Design a protein with these regions (language model features):
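Acidic, glycine-enriched active-site microenvironments
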Residues: 1-250
Length: 250
């Protein structure tokens, strides 16, 4: 049945939220009945797809937690990358993923203000971004109750970036956050990524492992977001470079 329980209440709520008078009808015959049936089927198919995607996302999150030996559920992953050209217009980017996939409303960009941006020091840039992000969290939510604390931090980089991040967190008194760096192998080949934990030996995943593809997508999204923010900043400063036309530069 396509009938709605308490249609008067639903009409009232919809009218209030849209500022238009909404009238619910339930046609049994004719063109309107066909439209309602088609809409119902489309909604069911969309819900089935969404449930399937959510189930797959949950499987990937669990697989990533297992790969990193993390016991807690990964409800929020933050991925960081920085973008600049020789230190100019340096930007840090943070993207977020969770059980429902990428959470674009939670993305953040950081205009790198310190001397790091002037010298092109990638490690100092990462330290500044991490310090600003988590100093703010410590002020806004010291009890970690609002769901904005990450269950996992992923850094686009190797041992240097991971060490810089871990040391910055330690200076803030944060020693319990899960952290991993992801860097391409010596040949810079996708599929041969190495995973870096603080003061541990790097390891890799099978190139066919779905978890590896998942991490690659997260890293690529962070890279895309950081480069986009960097180019927007360059454009705003009225300085564009031929390098901006080269995919992946930044």
């Amino acid at each position: 049945s396509n009938s709605i329980e308490n249609p008067e209440l639903v009409e009232h709520l919809l009218s209030k939220s849209t500022q238009y008078k909404i009238k619910i009808s339930n046609p049994k015959y004719g063109e309107k009945a066909v439209l309602v049936e088609n809409a119902r089927r489309n909604a069911e198919e969309a819900l089935a797809r969404r449930n399937s995607e959510s189930a797959n996302q949950a499987k990937l999150l669990k697989g990533l937690a297992n790969a990193l030996d993390i016991k807690d559920k990964l409800n929020r992953i933050e991925v960081y990358d920085n973008s600049h050209i020789q230190g100019t217009n340096a930007i840090g980017g943070m993207v977020v993923s969770g059980p429902e996939g990428l959470e674009k409303s939670a993305y953040r960009k950081f205009n790198i203000k310190e001397a790091a941006g002037q010298t092109g020091d990638d490690l100092a840039m990462m330290k500044e971004v991490i310090n600003r992000r988590f100093s703010k969290l410590l002020i806004e939510d010291p009890g970690r109750k609002n769901g904005n604390w990450p269950d996992l931090i992923i850094i686009d980089g190797g041992v240097g970036q991971v060490s810089a991040t871990a040391e910055t967190l330690k200076e803030l008194g944060l020693k319990d956050l899960n952290l991993v760096g992801v860097a391409k192998g010596e040949q810079r080949d996708a599929g041969k990524e190495l995973f870096y934990r603080y003061k541990e030996k790097p390891f890799s995943l099978r190139h066919t492992d779905p978890v590896l593809y998942f991490v690659q997508r997260l890293r690529d999204e962070a890279h895309r977001f950081a480069i986009g923010a960097h180019r927007a900043k360059r454009k705003k400063s009225n300085f564009m470079s031929p390098l901006d036309q080269i995919k992946g530069v930044g």
